[in-house]
Amino acid sequence: MTKIIFMGTPDFSTTVLEMLIAEHDVIAVVTQPDRPVGRKRVMTPPPVKKVAMKYDLPVYQPEKLSGSEELEQLLQLDVDLIVTAAFGQLLPESLLALPNLGAINVHASLLPKYRGGAPIHQAIIDGEQETGITIMYMVKKLDAGNIISQQAIKIEENDNVGTMHDKLSVLGADLLKETLPSIIEGTNESVPQDDTQATFASNIRREDERISWNKPGRQVFNQIRGLSPWPVAYTTMDDTNLKIYDAELVETNKINEPGTIIETTKKAIIVATNDNEAVAIKDMQLAGKKRMLAANYLSGAQNTLVGKKLI
């Protein structure tokens, strides 16, 4: 069986790892260190570590792989192939050169579009109607290696980061399973990326999460679904942060300053943007409160909201 080192961290990576364990010989798993999570800051292992522990696989968790003791240990292994999926660190050249079959990455975009750490988020924020999975050889430069295989998938109007993450996780494992036999046999082809067509999807920053209502409704809507259910787009109402998990676009003839609540229904808070498409907030969370449907919030506040300004 092909001896594989797997490198990944979040839930996206676990589907790929489970497939590799079932089909090949995973001799080591490399992931990020445990991190404190929640208000009580409980040290929590990354999802990939949980899967590896279930199968009693050796786990390496370097804070930074380059120059680490873990890297030296990995370089001593007899390995055929390195597979990464959302690992979160660049690999040192010494490790890239270790396996005789090379190092490959499962990336959640149709490269060369959306190189970087947040390709699913950015594709939705940009209003793309499709994205996909790329299996590629790894090189020193970020997400720039030759493409081995790709498969596209449609982004539906009601998709958000959560739904596309789940679809792409399965697609990534399936495409890798289809692609690996030719890689192992040495019969696969690969195509260089056109660097002139490259776009980038950097990790989401806090400032990317704040909604600017002075934009077309479609852009605000895409931002909300492109950040849901994590890290979540937010605005401010009455000096209190308001996270918005779900919304929809509605046509309006009412002319109001962007960010103004122009109407409430039984199920939504409707907010003006800078065009004739308003945003209807359906699922929300005020700071310090539990997440709730707008319908539940409106049962006690419906008559007090119209005219308020979100900023």
From Swiss-Prot:
Catalytic reaction annotation: L-methionyl-tRNA(fMet) + (6R)-10-formyltetrahydrofolate = N-formyl-L-methionyl-tRNA(fMet) + (6S)-5,6,7,8-tetrahydrofolate + H(+)
EC number in record: 2.1.2.9
Entry-linked InterPro entries: Fmt, Formyl_trans_C, Formyl_trans_C_sf, Formyl_transf_N, Formyl_transf_N_sf, Formyl_transferase-like_C_sf, GART_AS, Met-tRNA-FMT_C
This protein's UniProt keywords: Protein biosynthesis, Transferase
GO biological process terms held by the UniProt record: conversion of methionyl-tRNA to N-formyl-methionyl-tRNA
GO molecular function, one term: methionyl-tRNA formyltransferase activity
Coiled coil: none
Residues noted as binding (6S)-5,6,7,8-tetrahydrofolate in the record, renumbered to the chain: S109, L110, L111, P112
SUPFAM superfamilies for the chain: FMT C-terminal domain-like (SSF50486), Formyltransferase (SSF53328)
Top EC class, one word: transferase
Protein family per UniProt: Belongs to the Fmt family.
NCBIfam families for this protein: fmt (TIGR00460)
Function summary: Attaches a formyl group to the free amino group of methionyl-tRNA(fMet). The formyl group appears to play a dual role in the initiator identity of N-formylmethionyl-tRNA by promoting its recognition by IF2 and preventing the misappropriation of this tRNA by the elongation apparatus.
PANTHER family: METHIONYL-TRNA FORMYLTRANSFERASE, METHIONYL-TRNA FORMYLTRANSFERASE, MITOCHONDRIAL
UniProt name for this protein: Methionyl-tRNA formyltransferase
Species whose genome carries this gene: Staphylococcus aureus (strain NCTC 8325 / PS 47)
